């Protein structure tokens, strides 16, 4: 079965239906949909960010993905051990707040980056991390929402995205099966069947 629902000993098959992001069909029989992730690679330099958009288009990406948060919307400013990075990374000893201040994509850049991506034939959407980010993305008329796997248990955030009736892409990398099921169910309860799961 492509998608299994166990009812007693019976397995039902639900074939995935096609959906579209900015008019580009995604699903069985369609070309692979390639998303270029900007993340923090802009290094707080807008011109570098624009260069990344152009590089993504030249490489054949169908979409550019941003991340929409600020240090204050994703964590608190604290130097307590729980808020310090450890474990042998490049950022050991730094606070989470400090890291996110360096890594975030300024919100005033995002409409301009979206416009640049669209000029080059790419869709542009983002990962929100709190309700204000969803509201901002709606103002920009972004065509889809990508939920980071660390946020898959944030059911209120997922419901807010689902209520826009736009495609919701759920990353599942660090999620348990039950968490994935709860996220999918939340979308469906909001009447949104446009759900994509990423391994």
PLM features per residue range, with description:
Residues 63-102:
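Glycine-rich, proline-tolerant flexible connector loops at the mouths of alpha/beta enzymes
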Residues 89-150:
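Active-site beta->alpha loop and helix N-cap motifs at the rims of alpha/beta catalytic domains
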Residues 34-48, 99-103, 123-127:
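Active-site mouth loops of central-metabolism enzymes
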Residues 16-35:
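N-terminal amphipathic alpha-helix/helix-capping segment at the start of soluble metabolic enzymes
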Residues 34-36, 64-66, 124-126, 145-147, ...:
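Hydrophobic faces of well-ordered beta-strands that scaffold small-molecule active sites
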Residues 177-199:
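Catalytic alpha/beta core domains of metabolic enzymes, predominantly
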Residues 147-165, 176-183:
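Active-site-adjacent beta->alpha loops and helix N-cap segments on the catalytic face
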Residues 138-145, 163-168, 188-194:
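Glycine-enriched alpha-helix->loop->beta-strand junction motifs that scaffold or abut catalytic
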């Amino acid at each position: 079965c492509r998608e299994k629902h166990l009812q007693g000993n019976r397995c039902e098959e639900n074939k995935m239906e096609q959906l579209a992001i900015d008019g580009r069909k995604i699903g069985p029989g369609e070309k692979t949909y390639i998303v270029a992730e900007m993340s923090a690679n802009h290094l707080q330099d807008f011109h570098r960010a624009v260069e990344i958009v152009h590089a993504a288009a030249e490489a054949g990406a169908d979409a550019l993905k941003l991340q929409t948060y600020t240090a204050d919307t994703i964590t608190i400013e604290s130097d307590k051990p729980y808020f310090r990075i450890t474990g042998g990374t490049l950022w050991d000893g730094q606070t989470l707040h400090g890291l996110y201040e360096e890594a975030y994509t300024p919100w005033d850049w995002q409409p301009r980056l979206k416009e640049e991506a669209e000029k080059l034939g790419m869709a542009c959407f983002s990962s929100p991390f709190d309700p204000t980010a969803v509201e901002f993305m709606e103002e920009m008329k972004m065509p889809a929402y990508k939920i980071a796997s660390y946020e898959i248990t944030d059911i209120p955030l997922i419901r807010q995205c689902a209520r826009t009736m736009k495609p919701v892409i759920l990353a599942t990398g660090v999620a348990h099966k039950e968490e994935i099921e709860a996220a999918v169910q939340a979308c469906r309860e909001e009447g949104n069947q446009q759900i994509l799961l990423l391994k």
